[in-house]
Amino acid sequence: MLAKKQKMQETDTEQEATPHTIQARLVSDTGEEAGPPIDLPAGITTQQLGLICNALLKNEEATPYLFFVGEDEIKKSLEDTLDLASVDTENVIDIVYQPQAVFKVRPVTRCTSSMPGHAEAVVSLNFSPDGAHLASGSGDTTVRLWDLNTETPHFTCTGHKQWVLCVSWAPDGKRLASGCKAGSIIIWDPETGQQKGRPLSGHKKHINCLAWEPYHRDPECRKLASASGDGDCRIWDVKLGQCLMNIAGHTNAVTAVRWGGAGLIYTSSKDRTVKMWRAADGILCRTFSGHAHWVNNIALSTDYVLRTGPFHPVKDRSKSHLSLSTEELQESALKRYQAVCPDEVESLVSCSDDNTLYLWRNNQNKCVERMTGHQNVVNDVKYSPDVKLIASASFDKSVRLWRASDGQYMATFRGHVQAVYTVAWSADSRLIVSGSKDSTLKVWSVQTKKLAQELPGHADEVFGVDWAPDGSRVASGGKDKVIKLWAY
């Protein structure tokens, strides 16, 4: 009995010996130290850590941060996250801080308008870089440009002879390109709704995807890359209306194309590969192999920053950029690109009919991670604007969330009752919207890993979804021929 009592006293003193202060260092996710090691109380909260971090970094405006110890996020306080008994008081603990978006995008909760007009299914949707305009492509062979203030069509653009499969805004917002099932590409003037020059013809099959050269590489936005079912990727000068280059190398349909910020073009194909080309001369730089079936789509880590060019659509709402010269705008676009991709090493992720995704870096042939877990075809994949996360949409009715740095699985969002066709991110990287065959849109919260909002309203399958780059609204369209706008 005495021995037992002694033992209890010992454990009591052990508990008392648990450290009440912990030596810690605040380190950025790229490894830079915010300051020297400091003694922190074990009960310190994330709010208090935020104040210390902002003070150490001498931030003029308070930035919200996430904090991690190893893989574990500090949700409430340090002692909740750490196993205090096993903490070595001699050693300094690294607390990694990650800046979050300063602004918050509110979850869209209601349909603000239903815009009929198309006579066939709406196949593609794309907001302009500043979020002020919306373009849609439809099975009725037309492209429509919508005025988002009055929520009516500005222009109905006629010229294609077949289904319009993709629409893409130039990064300066002054041109719109559309590609159709017949293989022709038309450039439109969004101010007038008129064609600019002759259609760009040369492809022998349908156009699957279009990508413009980034603004910081050419503020004139003259060059456009197209991916076609004929197995080729072509580069066009839209001002001259000429094909500058035909990049042949895939042995089956090219499903997607991305124009990176470092002078490289990435293509995915039904030949099961992703290829990387030099934009200047069309030379093949790398072939990324690994998928066992068609590659349906690719996403680039720099997609959001390249889409929005010189300005951040939320932070730069003041429209001060209207007075800037082209050189200043180009400089601003380059700065934004370099902030996301300082060493020009872009990451890309490919999704396939083999139910997997692969994460690649443009400076190595071997994949960083084979991302498995989906039980069916993976149709769409997108990087979050802050490049921390990846979302994928699958025919297995789920959306999955992955860590962008190493492709590790994070969460599964279940709720759709049929195939998920497409996903889009909010500008603050906190929300994902998905569109499905089950006729609904769903908004998911990254923080809670749960459904944030159910958006029923379409009468049939949802093919296209886009979240405005300024976070203000979501647009969706599909088989019921109606475009719906959703807002808070």
Swiss-Prot record:
State where it is primarily located: nucleus
Region annotated Ubiquitin-like (UBL) domain sits at 19-101
Where does this protein reside within or beyond the cell? Nucleus, Nucleolus
What residue spans carry the region label Disordered?
Answer: 1-22
- Which GO cellular component terms are attached? nucleolus
Is Repeat set as a keyword in this record?
A: yes
Renumbered ranges of WD repeats:
117-156, 159-198, 202-246, 249-287, 329-370, 373-412, 415-454, 457-488
Pfam families associated with the record: NLE (PF08154), WD40 (PF00400)
Q: Which GO terms are recorded in the biological process aspect for this UniProt protein?
A: negative regulation of Notch signaling pathway; Notch signaling pathway; positive regulation of Notch signaling pathway; regulation of Notch signaling pathway
Q: Which domain of life is it from?
A: Eukaryota
The protein's GO terms of the molecular function aspect are: Notch binding
Q: Show the SUPFAM superfamilies listed in the entry.
A: WD40 repeat-like
Q: Nucleus as a keyword?
A: yes
Listed disulfide bonds for this chain? none
What keywords are assigned to this protein? Notch signaling pathway, Nucleus, Repeat, WD repeat
- Function field: Plays a role in regulating Notch activity.
Q: What else is known?
A: The name 'Notchless' derives from the ability to suppress the wing notching caused by some Notch mutant alleles.
Q: How does it assemble?
A: Interacts with Notch (via cytoplasmic domain). Associates with the pre-60S ribosomal particle.
The entry sums up its family as follows: Belongs to the NLE1/RSA4 family.
This protein's name: Protein Notchless
The organism named in the record is Drosophila melanogaster
Report the gene name.
Answer: Nle
